[in-house]
Amino acid sequence: LSEFMEDASNLHEEFYFFGKGNFLLHDRINYELVGKVVKRFLKDNQIDVFYMTSPFDENMTLYRKEWFEGVTVVATVYDIIPYMRKDQYYPRFSRAKQYYEMRIDMLKWVDQILVISESVKQDMIKYMNFAPEKIDVIWGAVDERFKEIPVAAETEKEIREKFGITDSFIICTGGADGRKNLDGLIRAFGAMPTELKEQYQLVIVCKLSQEAVDGFMKLAKESDADGRVICTNFVTDEELLILYNLAHLTAFPSKYEGFGLPVVESWACGTPVLTSNNSSLVEVGGDGAVLVNPNDVSDITRGLVQALSETDLEELLQKGKKRLERFRWKVV
């Protein structure tokens, strides 16, 4: 696609201003005007296929079927987490239910839906009653910037000093969203044998509020892991790459993912993986990762202990690297 875009003679961009805060898109009274703009764009550019890159994005227009007469409409869905976990996500925003379900109605009339895992496809069939033949799986893939690199001794020293990493470490890239299960991971880490906690640190790499950091540090103390859990907060792309390469193990026991990029990013950087036995993670991880039940802290502990003291991590990594080849952009 990138090669096509570089060489295509008729490639151009058009931008439409829908007012401050996209207010034209939020008021139904303006939709006749928006529809005229869309139909003119399709006609003037002789569009055959219209692709919605992210239909649930808050700035995405709520398109109407009648605007696309004679045009094939395709959309990519990355997950349906808010719909599957309504009790958790809908209360966060006053109009979340209306907003989300109006976009589901929009997807009902598009011609074809692309999803990034078989798990998402099955979720849409089960929870939204979509026809299987309307959904095609096109896997997610790892960005080429994630790779094994030599880390100079001075660079490693600087990174370790910046983030307070003194020992071998387990890396987790996630977020404060409870679905990412950082609290479960911290509890599981704290339940490991003392000798393993003395040997390894748990390094949580993601942007967090100070309130979230304080909460995780408090939990670490309560979980008998005081001083062994580090929250880096925001890191640059370069720092993330170095941390992946330096880590002994990636732990990503998320409760649900549409794909699970940290799994393939870790493999690409030469780091073995522990992840969940649910959703897309079991599809992606397969036999190339230690799989755990993310809802069972004791099973996460079991997986950590297995990975750190019982498993041949090099053999596990090689299986992961073999699986990684199907998740590269040149393949998908």
Q: Model-found features: residue ranges?
A:
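Carbohydrate transferase catalytic cores enriched for Leloir-type hexosyltransferases
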Residues: 1-332
